[in-house]
């Protein structure tokens, strides 16, 4: 008997599963002990038992949420120094990080964020903090990183590291002529 034929599979009841996701007004961040609903003006703590939707296990940050004074954050200090202690660059970087942590995107408003060295040359400089920033974001959202120097759109399985639960895709150190429009 072939159990996985359409004859047998059609007898199985289907289940409508609603995955939790961000909206235009809020972003969700999932920790081991609770979820956070982050809006422009507020952070609301939500117990998982009260949610009426599901979350990908791989999108849950593997640590408990503990409220701390964000002014003492090493990552915040790093962003400040990586921004050259310029208030404008610092605020821009905070906006970029916020945009990347917020998963609600539309086809008409979906941006590629490009982090580059202050001085662009044919030799990669490194040391400007791009990798640390991406790593930091990767600790908050499910991230897949692809080597931009060797990436080829025409290669079989070019996106094999991207899964249904991947939230962000980072091309690390892309070639000069990388086709962002593709």
Which sequence ranges carry the predicted segments?
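P-loop NTPase catalytic core of nucleic-acid-dependent motor ATPases
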Residues: 35-166
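Positively charged interface segments
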Residues: 1, 16-19, 24, 148-159, ...
């Amino acid at each position: 008997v072939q159990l996985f034929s359409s004859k047998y599979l059609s007898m199985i009841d289907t289940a409508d599963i609603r995955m939790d996701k961000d909206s235009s007004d809020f972003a969700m961040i999932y920790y081991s002990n609770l979820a956070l609903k982050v809006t422009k003006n507020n952070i609301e703590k939500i117990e998982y038992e009260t949610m009426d939707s599901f979350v990908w296990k791989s999108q849950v940050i593997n640590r408990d949420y503990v409220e701390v004074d964000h002014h003492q954050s090493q990552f915040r200090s790093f962003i400040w120094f990586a921004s050259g202690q310029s208030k404008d660059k610092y605020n821009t970087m905070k906006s970029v990080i916020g945009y990347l942590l917020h998963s609600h995107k539309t086809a008409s408003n979906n941006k590629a964020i490009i982090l580059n060295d202050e001085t662009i040359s044919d030799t990669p400089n490194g040391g400007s903090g791009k990798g640390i920033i991406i790593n930091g974001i990767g600790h908050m959202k499910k991230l897949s990183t692809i080597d931009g120097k060797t990436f080829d759109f025409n290669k079989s399985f070019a996106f094999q590291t991207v899964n249904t639960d991947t939230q962000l895709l980072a091309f690390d150190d892309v070639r000069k002529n990388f086709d962002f429009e593709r």
